[in-house]
């Protein structure tokens, strides 16, 4: 049994930035620091930050007056920002800059009076944050959420000639392209973003897992069950005809999965740290893996700046 590692895998620039914001805020201002929603969707990361002094809450009414609060990488509705400002809370915004780009697109279309179709998963924090950029006070348009291609057939927008679309950043690239094509067929005048809203890391990890699936008879994806991008990786492998499982850590591996398998692929979602991948590798070696190699993949060098107040000051 041989293990192949996908490349790239694991943390993206937005996740790195969000986690570092929480760590630096605790170091700079002291605990506790409040974080609205899980800063990234990974249990290991959240538990580690809790031990450092982060307190995770779902809404701002759980945050005391005069406290510091961090918005998660998924972004927040405008109403949440306004509430934080009204209460005088100190805020650090860990929203991924690529999600912020989508927020700006929605706000721009809103001001222009357009209808907007958001392609995404209902209930996901990123979708809730993006939907929350819309305000009837800004313009006469309407925002619609479409989750799959079947919903396009029943979609009835108010302004078919004044329509734009945008997407959640962590979707399946193939599924999203299919939905966009169906929308364009139904609404030929629909506008789109200049560049795809699906982020570089999502695209790269999906390309990498497909490369992995072509060479393996089992693909393990390290990621938490509430991680959208991690779920998409496992789905893609299965869609390509390969058995695949999403696991939080090495303890979730069922030895029965690897019986008779010759090549096991291993990757990780954008919110899963390398330490969990290392743990899975160690467990696979215990179960008989004889070697490990890493596939070639798209190099990633993107880095997002931290808020000025949290940047390290160089002395000397």
UniProtKB/Swiss-Prot annotation:
This is 4-hydroxy-3-methylbut-2-enyl diphosphate reductase. Pfam families: LYTB. Catalyzes the conversion of 1-hydroxy-2-methyl-2-(E)-butenyl 4-diphosphate (HMBPP) into a mixture of isopentenyl diphosphate (IPP) and dimethylallyl diphosphate (DMAPP). Acts in the terminal step of the DOXP/MEP pathway for isoprenoid precursor biosynthesis. One of its GO terms (biological process) is isopentenyl diphosphate biosynthetic process, methylerythritol 4-phosphate pathway. (2E)-4-hydroxy-3-methylbut-2-enyl diphosphate binds at residues 41, 74, 124, 169, 227-229, 271. Pathway: Isoprenoid biosynthesis; dimethylallyl diphosphate biosynthesis; dimethylallyl diphosphate from (2E)-4-hydroxy-3-methylbutenyl diphosphate: step 1/1; Isoprenoid biosynthesis; isopentenyl diphosphate biosynthesis via DXP pathway; isopentenyl diphosphate from 1-deoxy-D-xylulose 5-phosphate: step 6/6. It comes from Xanthomonas oryzae pv. oryzae (strain KACC10331 / KXO85). It catalyses: isopentenyl diphosphate + 2 oxidized [2Fe-2S]-[ferredoxin] + H2O = (2E)-4-hydroxy-3-methylbut-2-enyl diphosphate + 2 reduced [2Fe-2S]-[ferredoxin] + 2 H(+); dimethylallyl diphosphate + 2 oxidized [2Fe-2S]-[ferredoxin] + H2O = (2E)-4-hydroxy-3-methylbut-2-enyl diphosphate + 2 reduced [2Fe-2S]-[ferredoxin] + 2 H(+). Its cofactor is [4Fe-4S] cluster. The active site is at residue 126. It is an enzyme of class 1 (oxidoreductase). [4Fe-4S] cluster binds at residues 12, 96, 199. Belongs to the IspH family.
């Amino acid at each position: 049994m041989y293990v192949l590692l996908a490349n790239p895998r694991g943390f993206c620039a937005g996740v790195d930035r969000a986690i570092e914001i929480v760590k630096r805020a605790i170091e700079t201002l002291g605990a506790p620091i409040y974080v609205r929603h899980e800063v990234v969707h990974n249990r290991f990361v959240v538990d580690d930050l809790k031990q450092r002094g982060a307190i995770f809450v779902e809404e701002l009414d759980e945050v005391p007056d005069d406290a510091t609060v961090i918005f998660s990488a998924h972004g927040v509705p405008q109403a949440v920002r306004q509430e934080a400002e009204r209460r005088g809370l100190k805020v650090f915004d860990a929203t991924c800059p690529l999600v912020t780009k989508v927020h700006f697109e929605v706000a721009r279309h809103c001001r222009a009076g357009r209808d907007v179709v958001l392609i995404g998963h209902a209930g996901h924090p990123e979708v809730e944050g993006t939907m929350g950029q819309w305000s009837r006070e800004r313009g006469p348009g309407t925002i619609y959420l479409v989750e799959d291609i079947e919903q396009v057939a029943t979609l009835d927008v108010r302004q078919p000639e004044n329509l734009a679309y945008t997407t959640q950043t962590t979707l399946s690239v193939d599924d999203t392209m299919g939905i966009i094509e169906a929308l364009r067929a139904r609404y030929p005048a629909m506008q789109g973003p200049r560049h795809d809203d699906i982020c570089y890391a999502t695209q790269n990890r999906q390309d990498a897992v497909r490369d992995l699936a072509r060479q393996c008879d089992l693909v393990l994806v390290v990621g938490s069950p509430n991680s959208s991008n991690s779920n998409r990786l496992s789905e893609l492998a299965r869609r390509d005809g390969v058995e695949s499982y999403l696991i939080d850590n090495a303890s979730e591996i069922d030895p029965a999965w690897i019986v008779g398998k010759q090549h096991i692929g291993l990757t990780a979602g954008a919110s899963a740290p390398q330490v969990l991948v290392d743990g899975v590798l160690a467990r696979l070696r215990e179960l008989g893996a004889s070697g490990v190699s890493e596939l070639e993949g798209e190099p990633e060098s993107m880095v997002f700046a931290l808020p000025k107040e949290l940047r390290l000051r160089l002395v000397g």
